[in-house]
């Protein structure tokens, strides 16, 4: 059987009291396939269900969930890209969380809240509110302050360059994580070819 390392000593003590024969060993690479229990903090834990749809890391691999979670929020916001829709998602999910009627779905609701928040940020930068360009709206003091960070309609290249920079950063960051993972699995020599 398999036991999480944090309760290994308690399990050994319990088995010793029962006078049961057992051997406590560490799993061997390429021989054993121990089950995985991910240990992430609260924010990254919300994204585990998304990561699990692709693949769960092996016992020896690096868990990518905390690394892809911020990118997922940002790219979801890029795709939605509307301040109004993001605010609507935030309000609905927060109302459902506070109502405490859907406690079984709390993680999904918090995930929806953070995705909505990312959409609010990217919607502010793209300058749209339910499809209305905010650069055309006059007389709202808050908008006057935000117009400096919004993409200008005639400056489509600024949005392109920002997307390009973020994409290159994500690819390089992913390659660095792959090097760390390969070093952890096979040693630094195997990571050099990455």
Segments from the language model and where they lie:
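Short beta-strand-to-loop capping motifs
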Residues: 1-5
């Amino acid at each position: 059987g398999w036991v999480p390392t944090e309760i290994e000593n308690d399990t050994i003590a319990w088995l010793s009291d029962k006078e049961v024969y057992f051997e406590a060993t560490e799993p061997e690479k390429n021989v054993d396939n121990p089950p995985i229990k991910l240990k992430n903090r609260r924010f990254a834990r919300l994204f585990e269900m998304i990561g699990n749809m692709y693949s769960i890391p092996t016992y020896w691999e690096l868990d990518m969930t905390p690394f892809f979670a911020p990118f997922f929020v940002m790219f979801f916001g890029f795709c939605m890209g509307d301040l109004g829709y993001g605010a609507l998602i935030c309000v609905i999910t927060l109302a459902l969380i506070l109502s405490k009627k859907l406690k079984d779905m709390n993680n999904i609701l918090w995930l929806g809240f953070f995705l909505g928040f990312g959409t609010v940020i990217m919607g502010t930068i793209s300058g749209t509110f339910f499809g209305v360009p905010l650069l055309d709206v006059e007389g709202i003091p808050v908008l006057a302050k935000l117009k400096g960070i919004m993409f200008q309609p005639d400056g489509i290249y600024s949005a392109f360059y920002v997307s390009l920079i973020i994409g290159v950063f994500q690819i390089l960051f992913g390659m660095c994580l792959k090097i760390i993972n390969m070093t952890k699995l096979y040693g630094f020599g195997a990571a050099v070819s990455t």
